[in-house]
């Protein structure tokens, strides 16, 4: 038999999960009830479009000090909410941006999309959910690398030292091609950003940006649609998304979310499946020990896919248009082409390419467009180069034939580990004119290599294009991929040892 105290406790628990009807309650704000299991009720300010409350399974998840919103908040917007059948749509309009939120009856998901005609004045386009860090302290999948709570700043205002470890919101990043879901979580709740559409973002398949950051007061869950963070492309206008914020109690949600209902919600810029086409074909010629990626882009959209082990591929559903088509070995471009996509049809297009070099005396690393395997590359994505967990940067000496790849640094800093010395042995038939080809992935502040071979000093190359963005200290390695060829005159290389 239950005591009165036990009975009251059970009734209280049950009351926290009982749902009202699917719908909108209107006052100074719109209160949206999703009518979902483990109930989801959220509140949107009618003047600003800020989400000011998110109650999931009876618990307030929203940070009380500041709302969740697009950019740094719209300030003021024309905000409306409508219910049609099984769907609710919230629309927030300014002169240059429209933010949409969509909810389906019974689902614990806030679907969103952002339509722009100009880049926001803050210079980047992002959605940030500011959530209660007491309830949702953890970040997934990379953990504490981006938890900067109580940290001491060591670089700008975005890299911190916490309990002897360097941390930054940038260390939460993942390549776009691999980032379909990132989450923050606690013992009773998990909130995930599900990303199934990058078409209007910028940067290509290997771009990466901030995903989450527990800064102490609140835990931020982001979707960065574009930014100047090591950005290689111009920004695209139009509709960004759909993207979805999924609420659960424990399990990690699937990334397979159907947002085709957006076609019925009068979303500016939304192109339904019927208005799209695909590209199918076979890629060939690249080194099969690496992943192969095919990438399509133009001024309006971008898409990508991994190929199968045999090289076959089918693109995502693409908006009609003519696209540059790129074939990568890892992240290294081996071929480019062009293809035109038409609505309602599949276009056949094969692509072939490989790395072409002359007779090679020595090679350090692989043709994959990444610093994988070089010293500190395994840590660089998740910590600052100054971190005590990093191996000694040098200066280092690499001896061809006996050194391991980790004896060569993944980055060269002028005041830290320059020069890097390479020793190699040449035969008599290798003493003619040669080319030392140095392939880089990223530069900063005009940094570029100048080589000396024995007594010959190569000319200083011109400065690379300035990305105007910190990279290697914020977990990035991919830039324009500048290549520097040093012409080595005949007789410079000698039989025997060379440096």
Swiss-Prot record:
State where the protein is found.
Answer: Secreted
Cellular component, GO, one term: extracellular region
The biological process GO terms on file are: cell wall organization; pectin catabolic process
Q: Name one GO molecular function term.
A: carbohydrate binding
Q: Which reaction does it catalyse?
A: Endotype eliminative cleavage of L-alpha-rhamnopyranosyl-(1->4)-alpha-D-galactopyranosyluronic acid bonds of rhamnogalacturonan I domains in ramified hairy regions of pectin leaving L-rhamnopyranose at the reducing end and 4-deoxy-4,5-unsaturated D-galactopyranosyluronic acid at the non-reducing end
Which SUPFAM superfamilies does the protein's record reference?
A: Galactose mutarotase-like, Galactose-binding domain-like, Starch-binding domain-like
The signal peptide annotation in the UniProt record is 1-20
Q: Does the keyword Secreted apply?
A: yes
For the keyword Disulfide bond, the answer is: yes
EC numbers listed for it are 4.2.2.23
Where is this chain primarily localised?
secreted
What is its biological role? Pectinolytic enzymes consist of four classes of enzymes: pectin lyase, polygalacturonase, pectin methylesterase and rhamnogalacturonase. Degrades the rhamnogalacturonan I (RG-I) backbone of pectin.
Instruction: Please give the family membership noted in the entry.
Output: Belongs to the polysaccharide lyase 4 family.
Protein name (Swiss-Prot/TrEMBL) = Rhamnogalacturonate lyase A
For this protein's source organism, the top of the classification is: Eukaryota, Fungi, Dikarya, Ascomycota, Pezizomycotina
């Amino acid at each position: 038999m239950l005591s009165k105290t036990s009975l009251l406790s059970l009734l209280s628990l049950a009351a926290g999960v009982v749902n009202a009807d699917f719908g909108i309650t209107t006052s100074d704000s719109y209160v949206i009830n999703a009518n979902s299991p483990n109930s989801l009720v959220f509140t949107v300010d009618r003047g600003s479009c800020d989400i000011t409350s998110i109650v999931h399974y009876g618990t307030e998840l929203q940070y009380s000090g500041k709302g969740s919103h697009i950019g740094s908040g719209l300030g003021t917007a024309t905000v409306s909410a409508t219910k049609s059948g099984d769907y609710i749509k919230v629309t927030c309009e300014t002169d240059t941006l429209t933010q949409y939120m969509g909810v389906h009856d019974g689902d614990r998901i806030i679907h969103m999309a952002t339509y722009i005609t100009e880049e926001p004045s803050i210079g980047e386009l992002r959605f940030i959910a500011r959530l209660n860090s007491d309830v949702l302290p953890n970040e997934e999948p990379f953990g504490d690398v981006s938890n900067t709570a109580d940290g001491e700043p060591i670089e700008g205002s975005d890299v911190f030292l916490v309990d002897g470890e360097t941390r930054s919101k940038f260390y939460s990043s993942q390549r776009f091609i691999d980032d379909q879901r990132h989450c923050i979580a606690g013992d009773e709740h998990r909130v995930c950003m599900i990303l199934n559409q990058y078409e209007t973002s910028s940067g290509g398949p290997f771009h990466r940006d901030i995903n989450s950051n527990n800064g102490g007061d609140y835990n931020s869950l982001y979707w960065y649609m574009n930014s100047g963070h090591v950005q290689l492309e111009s920004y695209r206008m139009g509709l960004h998304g759909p993207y979805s914020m999924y609420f659960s109690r424990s399990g990690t949600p699937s990334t397979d979310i159907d947002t085709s209902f957006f076609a019925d919600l009068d979303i500016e810029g939304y192109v339904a499946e019927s208005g799209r086409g695909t590209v199918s074909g076979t890629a060939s010629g690249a080194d099969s020990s690496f992943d192969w990626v095919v990438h399509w882009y133009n001024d309006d959209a971008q898409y990508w896919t991994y190929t199968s082990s045999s090289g076959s591929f089918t693109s995502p559903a693409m908006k009609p248009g003519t696209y540059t088509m790129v074939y990568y070995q890892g992240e290294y471009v081996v071929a480019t082409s062009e293809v035109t996509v038409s609505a309602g049809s599949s276009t056949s297009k094969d692509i072939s390419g490989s790395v072409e070099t002359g007779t090679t005396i020595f090679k350090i690393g692989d043709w994959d467009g990444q610093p994988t395997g070089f010293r500190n590359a395994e840590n660089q994505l998740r910590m600052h180069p100054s971190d005590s967990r990093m191996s000694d940067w040098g200066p280092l000496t690499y001896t061809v034939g006996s050194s391991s790849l980790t004896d060569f640094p993944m980055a060269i800093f002028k005041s830290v580990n320059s020069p890097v010395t390479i020793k190699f042995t040449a035969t008599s038939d290798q003493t003619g004119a040669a080319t030392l080809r140095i392939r880089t992935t990223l530069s900063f502040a005009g940094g570029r290599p100048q080589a000396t071979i024995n007594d010959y000093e190569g000319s200083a190359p011109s400065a690379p294009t300035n990305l105007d963005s910190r990279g290697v200290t914020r977990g990035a390695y991919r830039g324009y991929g500048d290549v520097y060829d040093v012409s080595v005159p005949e007789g410079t290389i000698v039989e025997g040892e060379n440096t």
